[in-house]
Amino acid sequence: MTTDELRDQQYAKTLQRLIRMETVSVAGDRSTEKFERFHSLLRELFPNLFEKSDVENFSGSLLMRWPGECSEKPILLMSHHDVVEAVGSWSHGPFSGDIEDGKLWGRGSLDTKCSLWAMLQ
């Protein structure tokens, strides 16, 4: 297996772990436990980011400031990790993280745990 294939395989496994975390956001539900579990997984997967950042946790959300060392203007990277309810029938479970024919299936694979993962990677 090539280095690129190994890297792609590792990336897929990491993203699968994010997809498999159920983070459904329901109107009126103020509980944050599932989001706190997701944050714990992020801390495990991206320890350097959490060590080097100022992290604020509020209402199930994270605000992270990573101080820079240059005089350039700051940038903003923004994403979300909640997903909508999984209703209807699914060919793959909504939180399965299945990979079939090179495609990763599950809530958040497009909107938007994938972009969050890419930013943190």
Task: Please provide the spans of the model-predicted regions.
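Acidic/His- and Gly-rich active-site-bordering loop/insert found
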Residues: 1-117
